């Protein structure tokens, strides 16, 4: 015979409130953003290759000359490293603030979320423009431009171009993560607006 009255059931696993899900998701996304920014910068900075290139000076016969290609030879790649480094520094600070808000000072802080939204949008612009600028230069290196006489270089510097492509792909991933963070922050802030 089952006793009458209320019976408490135990839930499997911890129970999280919706705002805790937001905080945990935000912290995970910020860590993912930081990791992707660091990887993109490190891969770009380590992109350096030396190849023997045939050089012809009239009236002399062609000769082989060792030429080095590296990221510092293009202002777009320098901007890429600088922009992603700034975004990485901001991400370190915002990740620490997220963990502080998650672990030490629980509770929803609309002021912190609104500051994150504004600064995340600024960082989205920086990461987007840096990725676009570097991507444009990398594309010219890959395909060249016959109309203005720019020859492609990726057929000679394959390792360098592989590094550039990988760095740009990871940077684009960081751009998407940053966009998701902005959407998540706006959604969580909109839930606090009285209806």
From Swiss-Prot:
What transmembrane ranges does the database entry give? 27-47, 76-96, 121-143, 164-184
- Single GO cellular component term: plasma membrane
Q: Which UniProt keywords apply?
A: Cell membrane, Membrane, Transmembrane, Transmembrane helix
Topology with respect to the bilayer: Multi-pass membrane protein
Q: Where in the cell is it found?
A: Cell membrane
Cytoplasmic compartment ranges equal: 1-26, 97-120, 185-195
Membrane topology (Extracellular): 48-75, 144-163
Origin, by domain of life?
Answer: Eukaryota
Short name of any one Pfam family annotated for the protein: CASP_dom
Q: Which NCBIfam families match?
A: A_tha_TIGR01569
Similarity annotation: Belongs to the Casparian strip membrane proteins (CASP) family.
Question: Assembly and partners?
Answer: Homodimer and heterodimers.
Q: Name it.
A: CASP-like protein IN26
Protein source organism: Ipomoea nil (Japanese morning glory)
List the taxonomic lineage. Answer: Eukaryota, Viridiplantae, Streptophyta, Embryophyta, Tracheophyta
Q: Which gene is transcribed and translated to give this protein?
A: IN26
């Amino acid at each position: 015979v089952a006793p009458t009255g209320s019976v408490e059931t135990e839930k499997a696993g911890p129970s999280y409130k919706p705002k805790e899900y937001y905080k945990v998701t935000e912290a995970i996304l910020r860590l993912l953003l930081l990791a992707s920014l660091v990887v993109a910068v490190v891969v770009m900075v380590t992109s350096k290759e030396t190849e023997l290139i045939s050089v012809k000076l009239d009236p002399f016969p062609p000769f082989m000359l060792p030429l080095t290609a590296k990221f510092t030879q293009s202002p777009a790649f320098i901007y890429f490293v600088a922009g992603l480094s700034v975004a990485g520094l901001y991400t370190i600070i915002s990740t620490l603030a997220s963990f502080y808000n998650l672990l030490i000072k629980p509770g929803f802080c609309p002021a912190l979320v609104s500051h994150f939204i504004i600064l995340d949008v600024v960082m989205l612009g920086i990461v987007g423009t840096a990725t676009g600028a570097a991507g444009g230069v990398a594309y010219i290196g890959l395909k060249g431009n016959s109309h203005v006489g720019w020859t492609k270089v990726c057929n000679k510097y394959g390792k360098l171009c592989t590094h550039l492509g990988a760095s740009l792909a990871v940077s684009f991933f960081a751009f998407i993560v940053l966009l998701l963070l902005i959407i998540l922050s706006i959604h969580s802030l909109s839930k606090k607006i009285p209806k």
